[in-house]
């Protein structure tokens, strides 16, 4: 069985954070179709862990119309060349003010592979020291707090934490820390 082949591609929309493109495709059986894809820069997600607690941020997520707890994460479209570890350091410092002595890569995530090309790296940050956050204007409502492992697991199981990347990152942490 072959793969879907891109025959042509056109940009439908672009802004600083994303590109929406529509591709003409040929399926393995030869039939033609279209596929819409959201292209976004690579992101980094950081699991801040002080040995007993996890650092989470809470912010209003406009698309779902609610505040959400999640691990610090983000992209830097103007720094697309940035290595994932550097991006992780930047996001941690920017969103929480935290600095880490060590960043361990736990794995890679595909955000929504049925509609987006975006991929991200998950890093475990340890050796944490406090500092001042440097949040972007869009993050002005963000707050951060520390939670025990039991609290994080309860927040996930009760639906308080619903961010798929955060839940997947916690799963990677659990697999690495058996």
Question: Where are these predicted regions, by residue range?
Answer:
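Nudix hydrolase/Nudix homology domain
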Residues: 1-4, 31, 67, 105, ...
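N-terminal short leaders/motifs
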Residues: 1-9, 99
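Acidic, metal-coordinating catalytic segment for phosphate/diphosphate chemistry
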Residues: 8-45, 50
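Active-site segment of metal-dependent pyrophosphate-handling enzymes
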Residues: 19, 41, 53, 61-63, ...
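Short, well-ordered beta-strand micro-motif
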Residues: 22-24, 48, 124-126, 146-148, ...
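Short clusters of small/polar residues that mark proteolytic maturation junctions
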Residues: 36-37, 59, 110, 166
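Conserved Nudix-box catalytic region and its N-terminal flanking loop in Nudix hydrolases
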Residues: 38, 44-90, 138
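Catalytic glutamate of the conserved HExxH
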Residues: 90-95, 148
């Amino acid at each position: 069985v072959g793969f879907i082949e891109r025959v042509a591609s056109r940009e439908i929309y672009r802004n600083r954070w994303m590109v929406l493109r529509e591709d003409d495709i040929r399926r393995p059986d030869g039939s033609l179709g279209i596929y819409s894809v959201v292209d976004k820069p690579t992101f980094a997600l950081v699991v801040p862990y002080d040995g007993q607690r996890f650092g989470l941020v809470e912010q209003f997520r406009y698309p779902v119309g609610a505040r959400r707890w999640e691990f610090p994460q983000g992209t830097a479209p103007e720094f697309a060349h940035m290595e994932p570890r550097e991006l992780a350091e930047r996001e941690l410092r920017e969103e929480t003010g935290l600095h880490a002595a060590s960043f361990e890569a736990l794995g890679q995530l595909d955000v929504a592979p049925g509609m987006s090309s975006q991929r991200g790296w998950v890093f475990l940050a340890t050796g944490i020291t406090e500092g001042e956050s440097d949040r972007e204007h869009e993050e002005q409502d963000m707050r951060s707090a520390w939670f025990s492992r039991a609290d994080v697991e309860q927040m996930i199981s009760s639906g308080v934490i619903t961010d798929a990347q955060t839940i997947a990152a916690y799963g990677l942490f659990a697999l690495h820390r058996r």
